[in-house]
Amino acid sequence: MGADENKVPNKIQSIRQNKIKNDVQNAIQIQSFLKNIKSKYILKQIFDNIEKDKVFKLINYNKSIQNRLEIGLDDYKNKFLNVIKIEIIPKINCGKDKFINYIINENKYHIFFDEETNERKTNSFSLTNRASKVKITLYFEESSLKGLFKDCECIEKINFIRFKRKDIIDMSYMFYGCTSLKEVNLSNLITDNVKDMSFMFYKCQSLTELNLSKFNTKELINMKSIFSRCSALEKIDLSNLDTRNVEDMSYMFYECYYLNDVNLSKLIVKKLKNVSYMFYGCYSIQELNLANFDLNSALIEKKLVFSGCSSLKVFKVKGYYRGDVKDMFKGCSDDLIFNLEYPKEI
């Protein structure tokens, strides 16, 4: 063990006793102490005994420590470098005091870091009277982004610049109530282990188009109300989604009034239990291809699935549908209902 490492126990004890005050000078002193320590294990011991907010401060103020953590502590970096970099364009003169809130667990520590102003906020970040473009770095520990932008009515555009997390399991309510959101770039999102996307885009009523084709959804279970009340949504690409483990698609496109371009023909559903109200009120849809959906299964809840799809003319499903057509297709054209009740033999 080197001479510098012999000092470690005493330094750790000092850290415990003093609890590292919230000033930059202390952070700089600790950085100076850490410079010459090469041992991954010793570094880990030190960081384990520093309060999390101080670790974030160290990382922010010293790129060399950040680099050493990233390169040298592969198992440990996930704890402190769970970074998401986001570019946000707020609505001009929104007039509402709205915050980005990381609400999953109030007992955990989260930092929003404004790269333009060096402003740091814990647990929430105000967008009130912000500039035309805001770049934010979010540090967090949980494997969840539930409700991250919930009710942020002032955001018009979101771009995920950097997204290194692979262990996120919950993205439910992520953009819930973002009524001004017009554009969101999801290409960098890693969704490999996400199980819950329910209400993810609920009431994003300014979105006209969404591309989820790059999402890896092999673990996804819950899609309830994911696009519900996206009343301006016209086109959505779900062509590459893996839905083999999805159990709930109820209210999925509920009241997506202008949706007219959605291709579900490649979706494979094996564990589906609920599709009730899935397309309720989608009065612009003219064609639906659900070739892999077995709507005859008694195990699937399917109340009013296509109710109000008044423009629906072409409907494809696995086999002939033998259920209560008038309930599932309430409000659809008489011709469509007749053809479903009395299918022509091929």
Annotate each language-model stretch with its function.
Residues E153-C154, K164, T179-S180, I190, ...:
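Position-specific detector for the leucine-rich repeat
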Residues V134, L145, I158, M171, ...:
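Canonical leucine-rich repeat
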Residues M1-I168, N292-S297, K313-I346:
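N-terminal capping/linker segments that flank leucine-rich repeat
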Residues S144-C152, I169-T179, K195-C204, I221-A232, ...:
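Core hydrophobic positions of leucine-rich repeats
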Residues I158-M171, F175-N188:
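Conserved, compact domain cores that house catalytic/ligand-binding motifs in diverse enzymes
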Residues Q17, D192-N193, L210, E219, ...:
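Serine/threonine-rich, low-complexity intrinsically disordered segments
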Residues A131-K133, C152-I158, S180-V184, S206-L210, ...:
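Short loop/beta submotifs within extracellular cysteine-rich repeat domains
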